[in-house]
Amino acid sequence: MNSANVIEKKEFKNDNVNKVNQIKSEQLTADTYYFKPGQVLEYHRHPEGDQIFFVHEGEGVFCLDNGKEECTPLRPGVAVLAPKGVWHKIVANKELIVSQATKQPAGMQSKPI
């Protein structure tokens, strides 16, 4: 059985957002992102699959950009959807722990600056 406790084993990094793979199968992956205040998971998109984020601890902002930027606050208990092919980013206001589930392979493209 695959299982993970993302709260007991917090893995923050000072220089960047830390992405830790928790569980992976042929069709699905679950990762956890550990953010220090001010860290950003920059705009990117997944052309082959939706991505769902679940907030465990902390505060931040989740933004989508599909021609018009829309942002929503993140706090414990919140879940948000990044639809297939839509640019999305996360900004941490405080230490933030967010897990995500995505189909595999979903592909990944960074947004040009």
Where in this protein do the model-derived segments appear?
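Ligand-binding loop in jelly-roll beta-barrel domains
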Residues: 75, 84-109
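A short, N-terminal "cap"/entry segment at the start of jelly-roll beta-barrel domains
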Residues: 1-31, 42, 75, 111-113
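Conserved short histidine dyad/triad with adjacent acidic residue
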Residues: 31-47
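Short beta-strand segments in beta-sandwich/barrel cores
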Residues: 40-42, 58-63, 79
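Short, conserved beta-strand element in jelly-roll/cupin
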Residues: 35, 47-62
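Short acidic-glycine-tyrosine-enriched beta hairpin
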Residues: 68-84
